[in-house]
Every structure is written in structure tokens, then in C-alpha cells.
Amino acid sequence: EVTFDVSDVEEPQQENTVENRKKKASYVIASPFDGIAGDITTAPDEGFAGKMMGDGAAVEPTDPVVKAPADGEISFIFPTHHAIGFVTADGMEMLLHIGIDTVKLNGEGFEILVEEGAKVKKGDALMKIDLDYVKSHAPSLVSPILCTDLKENEKVRLLKTGAVKAGEDLFAVDIYE
């Protein structure tokens, strides 16, 4: 009886990009606020647009309440209150960065509603933004919502552009074999 392993069969060489592999899972990240969603490459900041901090989406908030984008845990709160580190229940490390160059506001315009280490559910309020203050004191309200530790086999797929509501699917992280 002849047996052979499928891996012994030569296949025509395909471009070995991640997208050609089989997708094995997807995690969906919700928008943390009502606003206008766009691709991260549209963020008005080269570091974020160039995905130096991670990949995700950029959302300009129209509502002051920042909500948890998934079930998870608050991993850190910047001393200047303009950004929150978040780890989803699936272990995805995220950064919710409100506005551009907002570190310079030294916490003015941001009210944190949670503590580091807090376990939260998708939709729980994390922060309140004084939209008028931040808009008039920072270059932009556009807020990068990022996955900061994506592995080589994990890719972001934007699910929503334009008007988005808090809790609506914003992007997926597809995990390939």
C-alpha cells in the first residue's frame, strides 16, 4: 500500500504573502465612540499613518464618551490622560489615542473614568473628552485606534469608513496560519 503525505506534493510557487494563507480566526474591534472612521493611513500624523505604533483605524469622535472597543482590561493610562492601553479578552494589545499631539495638553480636556487593571466589557465608558477644548488646543481630534503588537500572520481589515456609532464593528484582525 502506497501512502504519501500531502506536503510531499510540490505545488506551484505562489507569492508567499500572508493573505494567500488560510485564515484561522478573526477578532472584531468596535468603534470606541460615535464619529467619522477612516483608514489609519489617513491619520494627520506621520507616525500613526505610517503604522509605526501599530495598525488599526482612525476615528474622529463626535461624542465625548470613549467606550471599551471589546471585552478586556485596562493595561495602562497615560499620566496625561490622552491615551489608554487596553488588552482584549483575546490578548490583543491596543492603544486608544485620543487626538493628535494631545500629550501636550497635560491631561486638560480628558476625564478618565476607569483605573489601570480594571476589567471592562465592550461598551463600558472609559473616558470623557472635552471635544471643544481638545479641538481648539490640539492639531486634530482624529484618534488612532490601534493594535500595537500584531504578529507577522495578523492583518487588520477595516470594516467601516464614514459615520460610525460607538459599539459598531470598526475593524477586524484576521489571523492566518
PLM segments and residue spans:
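Contiguous, well-folded functional domains in the mature portion of proteins
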Residues: F4-E177
